[in-house]
Curated annotation (Swiss-Prot):
Catalytic activity, reaction form: N-terminal N-formyl-L-methionyl-[peptide] + H2O = N-terminal L-methionyl-[peptide] + formate
Cofactor(s) in the UniProt record: Fe(2+)
Protein name: Peptide deformylase
Gene symbol of the encoding locus: def
Segments traversing the membrane: none
Source organism of the structure: Mycolicibacterium smegmatis (strain ATCC 700084 / mc(2)155) (Mycobacterium smegmatis)
Keyword terms, alphabetized: Hydrolase, Iron, Metal-binding, Protein biosynthesis
CDD domains assigned to the protein according to its UniProt record, in alphabetical order: Pep_deformylase (cd00487)
Amino acid sequence: MAVVPIRIVGDPVLHTPTEPVPVGPDGSLPDDLPALIQDMFDTMDAANGVGLAANQIGVAKRLFVYDCAPTRGQTTRRRGVVINPVLETSEVPETMPDPDEDEEGCLSVPGENFPTGRADWARVTGLDADGSPITLEGEDLFARMLQHETGHLDGFLYLDRLVGRYARAAKKAVKRNGWGVPGLSWMPGEVPDPFGH
């Protein structure tokens, strides 16, 4: 399959809710879905990401892939795909995000990280690559990833969740980088890793 360009903040596909992946009466999934899923894994891996939503590569369908440790610093990772995810979370704290504990990045905002308030626990239900029901649940980094990727599919970037000085810093970063306009992307493997992995 292939590594494909990742869309950058400002591309309309990132700011529009995605469409559910059609499921046949017999539970079958579209014939072209395995190729899309493989492209997503290839692209996420080339970018050293922990997750990638379909709209980040320009496909407005409701699915994401992940390769994420349960908590920061762990080397054991969970890897898979969720089709048509539905998110459930604990309450999001109303305090300012901690600059050390709550830092978050995004492949569609390459090289930037900002503290982002998220729920401590999250669960996603949906379908796996075979169309079988799947439930993923986690805390810490895994919960953050579930919320981040599902947010993409709802048409939001983590920048939309930022508050106070973090929101102002993100707005300046978008302007400084010339982002916020349609048509921008970057190609993992062809440019230096924007996060320095």
